[in-house]
């Protein structure tokens, strides 16, 4: 069964297209008009082995907030749609990933119950402007938006880090690895991996 999705969403603030294939090879085509965000989403696709296409345009002349948030919303919706009924997946996964001095730990439960816990970023991280457009405060917000619309429980802990770029990128790479493992088919799992029979 193909685990793919294509979702478009347009508002007065942005237009977003996301296409993904959970069983891809990590091929990406990303254009959000926010260069650092493009870099992070490229890393997400590469290290999750999802094939990922993202095209987003928004009112970045005001702020990049709407474009970043709306892209995370559509990405979450596409992830959820591609998973289907979640039969046979591992469901739980975690990953710890370094980037030089930065270290991030991400735990995922593809539970159908959205939640996001985000802790440990160094003091002042939220005020840094990364790549000229992306403020550090957007990281938590986009992760919350993704988790809510993907309907996953997501725990992100930054264990170490100093460089603002590295702190964010370690989180994206750890998220990518955790998602990859969580959605992998487990040949020992019969049906839905829940005692309730539904996720």
Curated annotation (Swiss-Prot):
Keyword Isomerase: no
Enzyme class name: lyase
Source superkingdom: Bacteria
Keyword annotations of the record: Amino-acid biosynthesis, Cytoplasm, Histidine biosynthesis, Lyase
Compartments, record wording: Cytoplasm
Entry's family note: Belongs to the imidazoleglycerol-phosphate dehydratase family.
Protein name, entry field: Imidazoleglycerol-phosphate dehydratase
Organism in which the protein naturally occurs: Kineococcus radiotolerans (strain ATCC BAA-149 / DSM 14245 / SRS30216)
Organism classification: Bacteria, Bacillati, Actinomycetota, Actinomycetes, Kineosporiales
């Amino acid at each position: 069964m193909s685990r793919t999705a294509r979702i478009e969403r347009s508002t007065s603030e942005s237009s977003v297209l996301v296409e993904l294939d959970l069983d891809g090879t990590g091929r990406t085509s990303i254009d959000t008009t926010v260069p650092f965000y493009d870099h992070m989403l490229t890393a997400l696709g590469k290290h999750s082995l999802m094939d990922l296409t993202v095209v987003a345009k928004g009112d970045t002349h005001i702020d990049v907030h709407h474009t970043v948030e709306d892209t995370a919303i559509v990405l979450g919706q596409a992830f959820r749609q591609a998973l289907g009924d979640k039969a046979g997946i591992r469901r739980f996964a975690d990953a710890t990933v370094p980037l030089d001095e930065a270290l991030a730990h991400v735990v995922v439960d593809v539970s159908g119950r959205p939640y996001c816990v985000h802790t440990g970023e160094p003091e002042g991280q939220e005020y840094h402007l990364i790549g000229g457009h992306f403020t550090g405060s957007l990281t938590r917000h986009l992760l919350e938006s993704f988790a809510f619309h993907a309907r996953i429980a997501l725990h992100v802990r930054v264990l170490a880090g100093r460089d603002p770029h590295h702190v964010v990128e370690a989180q994206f790479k750890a998220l990518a690895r955790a998602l990859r493992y969580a959605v992998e088919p487990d040949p020992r799992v019969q049906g839905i991996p829940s005692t309730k029979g539904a996720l």
